[in-house]
Amino acid sequence: MGELLWTPPTDVREKSRIGDYLRWLRAERSLDFADYDELWQWSVSDLAGFWRSIWDYFDVRAYDQPTATLSDPTMPGARWFPGATLNYAEHVLRMPSRADADPIVVAHSQTRAPVTLTTAELREQVRRVRAGLRRLGVGRGDRVAAYAPNIPETFVLLLATTSLGAIFSSCAPEFGTRSVTDRWQQIEPKVLVAVDGYRYGDKPIDRRAEVVAIRTALPSVVHTVMLPYLDPNAAPPAGTSTWAELAGETDAALEFEPVPFDHPLYVLYSSGTTGLPKPIVHGHGGILLEHLKMLALHHDLGPADRFFWFSTTGWMMWNFLVSGPAVGATIVLFDGNPAVRAEPGKPAEPDLGSLWRLAADTGTTYFGTSAPFLLACRKADLRPGETVDLSALRGLGSTGAPLPAEGFTWVYDAVGRDLQLQSLSGGTDVCTGFVGGVPLLPVYAGEITCRALGARVEARSTEGKAVVGELGELVITAPMPSMPVGFWNDPDGRRYREAYFDVYPGVWRHGDWITISERGGCVITGRSDATLNRGGVRLGTAEFYSVVETLDEVVDSVVVHLEDAEGGAGDLLLFVVLADGLELDDTLRARIARELRTALSPRHVPDEIHQVRAVPRTLSAKKLEVPVKKILTGTPVDSAAATGALANPESLVAFERFARERTGH
């Protein structure tokens, strides 16, 4: 058990949104729960009762009422709220308990001055852009694609598109042409909205050539709308219109197309590290219910909050963030390089304090980021709680990778002792976290607090049995409304079934190793398909990184295990990226081995340690352990990884060269 770092206040039930929900359950459903575990058990055993309570508690507006809550619980293909019609955008724009003049979007950027939208201004912009899309012929089922960053216009476009019953999809503008076309050629968008470029730190990035290449590769695009972001005075290329024209004056009312509960809302994509990215279709109703539940009951967000999560439009956390107004929360957007201080007219300087200053300047109450960012701040010995005013901050979220115990202790030592740290894990596949935090439970170092309401998460042994207190495969044994409607262009559902249900029929296999404790806390130790198996003992990759990357000399690392075809122990290989100017020598190798042996076990000591310039990562910063392993076992680079999905595809060359040298081929 990790160190106890935070305990809920004694009046948590009186002051939290989940406390209010519990009182509502008592009054409206005659249900009384002594603690979170009882509530969770009910939420995953009476699925229809729980999800109908979410619908009713949050007063979901339906044009046609559902004939049932869950008419078919079979996975895949569970049928939620049949007969219901509603619209996601309408619920986001309800912005409960917010006045017209209240700020609802606060956006900071390294490309332009800050922008704030009030609730009235947001509705007005959505009204105009909705009318503009209709003028372009966009209607129900059409796809609208955004090659745009985390700025208010992208959020407005999402709401305008989905208000029409059209389907939204975004790629961040740092995505290269191949990465974008691999995604959008699958869904064939009718309209493309694209920025001319952006600024990353003090570096201008012109994307006009990429936009031309993307348009050329997408014959389905009938209209291209240019958003002059890098250069506000830039003339639009021939054959395109402008954002100002799209958002022009109109008498058209702001209306919302009623669509079925499972009508496609947006298409997100798997990382696409091997083959084409999987186009994951999410539905209006499932995303709405899941985000209402998570944002209000787990993150405790409401009209008094300012909610920030560092994300680009190419990561599902952006979609999660921008649902914030549905629970009344103001959202804080940031576009730029989080690791530099960039001021107009001055060269950018390395500085991990930028996001903390943003939180202070905007009065952020809930700060979301990634585990690698928190660990980088710890390594740089930042103490943001002492250097900027974070007095408004009461919640901090971490995701993207497991957060080790030392990351937890750094937050409580250097950021604030009174905030609740919520480490959460989920995926693009469900556009949420299915394990995370909740105001009712304490925080222990290195441990995800609980399984989320409505998420029947289990750890399964190699024999397929549910286990407690030991490592197992993370599975979900009951449907969730935000599971995908399906994959795009997968009419028989084969690709969808193969992705999640091929190992355990009728049970969602997520691909992570998880340990669930007796009290319900969770520890995720890495991807199950990247497992290290030493003498029959499974080792998670995350624990390696938590030790190796705390060393001052090590900037990044990746570990893989190469099995012995004849049944031997195989080889455990560790690759490290060192700080500038350092070379790996036997002294540092010995120190790394010693740290792993002492902190973990002798089994964790690599057979070989090698230096590389960079660890391959996806565009959402995830390490590519499986493709590295494939390359090291002889798979050609082009077959092992879709290079368009990588932030640094050139990093694969070193592993290919290493494989040749190692095998002599």
Spell out what each predicted region is:
Residues E38-W42, A89, V105-L158, G176-T181, ...:
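Conserved AMP-binding/adenylate-forming core of the ANL superfamily
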Residues A101-P103, T224-M226, P237-Y269, L276, ...:
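Conserved pre-ATP/AMP-binding loop-to-beta segment of ANL
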Residues A146, C171-G197, V211, A360, ...:
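AMP-binding/adenylate-forming catalytic core of the ANL superfamily
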Residues P149, V191-E210, D231, D335-P338, ...:
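Adenylate-forming
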Residues L159, S163-E245, S370-A371:
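Structural core segment of the AMP-binding/adenylate-forming
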Residues H223, V558-D564, L573-L574, A593-H665:
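Conserved C-terminal "lid"/linker of ANL adenylate-forming enzymes
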Residues L288-R306, G314-T365, A380-L382:
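Conserved AMP-binding/adenylation subdomain of ANL enzymes
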Residues L297, R394-G521, R527-T531, F544:
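Conserved AMP-binding/adenylate-forming
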